Regions:
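N-terminal alpha/beta PP-like core and its mobile active-site loop of ThDP/TPP-dependent enzymes
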Residues: 1-179
Length: 179
């Protein structure tokens, strides 16, 4: 089925069993908030992105599942760094999803552009930049697999804002069966 990147993201979060997501809205992620409003996922609004990251970390510690935090571009994304570092040091599974400037503006010092991929590299297990809506589902599934396997820890998924509005074919994940 043909869906926009934001809806693909939210569907993948539901596939992973995500029931709560922590965050603070911003312009680059408004499409995600529109998709979340039509989903089964509960958004927990915090007063600051750092608080959202620590709340997601606390959720992960308590539930044993990866916590999920959502932040906008620029200072919204950089506000996650302390929480990501804490999750990294304590091996807490976390998936941090950040919006960024539109793809064509990356690398041009655009308003609120921060290279959060490189900034977060020392304090994450892995980072992914989603460059097309068709990459969204594989990126989210990989982020959860990496966050929750081996030495657990935070994984960053950075998404240029226009990718949330681009469409791509989405196929739900096939559940794995165990005997």
């Amino acid at each position: 089925m043909l869906l926009n990147g934001a809806k693909i993201l939210v569907n993948c979060l539901e596939e992973q069993g995500v029931r709560n997501i922590f965050g603070y809205p911003g312009a680059s992620i408004l499409s995600v908030y529109d998709a979340l409003a039509k989903s089964s996922i509960r958004h927990v609004l915090t007063a600051h992105e750092q608080g959202a990251c620590f709340a997601a970390e606390g959720y992960a510690r308590r539930s044993g599942k990866a916590g999920v935090v959502l932040a906008t571009s620029g200072p919204g994304a950089t506000n996650l760094v302390t929480g990501l570092a804490d999750a990294y040091m304590d091996s807490v599974p976390l998936v941090a999803i950040t919006g960024n400037v539109p793809l064509a503006q990356l690398g041009h010092d655009s308003f609120q552009e921060v290279d959060i991929f490189d900034v977060s590299m020392p304090v994450t297990k892995y980072g992914i930049i989603v460059k097309s809506a068709s990459e969204m589902a594989p990126a989210i599934r990989r982020a959860f697999a990496l966050a929750e396997s081996g030495r657990k820890g935070p994984v960053l998924v950075d998404v240029p804002s226009d990718i949330f509005d681009c469409s791509a074919e989405y196929e739900p994940a096939v559940p794995e069966h165990t005997l």
